[in-house]
């Protein structure tokens, strides 16, 4: 549903028969932690079945999502209140919407986070893939997550077979590093 600048999955969407099946999930060994990611996991119509099966195998499950499908996320969380949800917000509003290629994406993701907090969900937080375009938003976004009492997780821009993208690179490494330093200083206050 998104057109993220660091992931071309939308240009080459997988076919349903190429996605991991419930039968395959049943064969997985026991795990301590499982992260369900995408593309966008909430596009799957069998996500509840996947979560149900994974809870037989995993102590902790977190779903990484862009938070766009608020009603689906809330519905799943009502059935599985112990699940973790990490909503990818790639910066403040304009930056997030440009990187994610989703008009109103920031408001949808932020609104979903607020809704989950209002529901009493405990394991919720922000996720941010840091790159040149959004590094200046690191500290402001951290402050928002901190005010909401939520985890703030970061990853550095990288390439992956699953992204259908091999050209991701941080061009201004000193600027990005300085913004990470600013975040560390904020955390140490």
Regions found by a protein language model. Give the residues of each.
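Conserved alpha-helical substructure of the radical SAM core
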Residues: 2-83, 161, 172-179, 183
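Radical SAM enzyme [4Fe-4S]-AdoMet core and its adjacent flexible, acidic
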Residues: 18, 52-53, 57, 83-90, ...
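Short, acidic Gly/Pro/Ser/Thr-rich loop/turn segments
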Residues: 1-2, 94
């Amino acid at each position: 549903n998104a057109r993220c600048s660091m992931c071309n999955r939308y240009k080459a969407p997988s076919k349903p028969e190429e996605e991991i099946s419930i039968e395959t999930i049943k064969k997985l060994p026991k795990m301590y932690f499982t992260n369900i990611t995408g593309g966008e996991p909430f596009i799957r119509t069998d996500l509840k079945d996947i979560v149900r099966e994974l809870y037989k195998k995993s102590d902790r499950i977190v779903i990484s999502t862009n938070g766009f499908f608020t009603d689906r996320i809330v519905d799943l969380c009502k059935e599985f209140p112990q699940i973790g949800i990490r909503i990818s917000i790639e910066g403040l509003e304009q930056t997030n919407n440009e990187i994610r290629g989703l008009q109103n994406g920031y408001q949808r993701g932020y609104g979903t986070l607020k809704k989950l907090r209002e529901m009493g969900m405990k394991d919720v937080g922000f996720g941010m893939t840091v790159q040149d375009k959004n590094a200046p938003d690191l500290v402001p976004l951290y402050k928002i997550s901190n005010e909401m009492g939520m985890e703030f997780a970061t990853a550095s821009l990288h390439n992956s077979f699953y992204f259908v993208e091999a050209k991701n690179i941080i061009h201004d490494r000193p600027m990005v590093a300085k913004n990470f330093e600013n975040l560390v200083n904020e955390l140490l206050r």
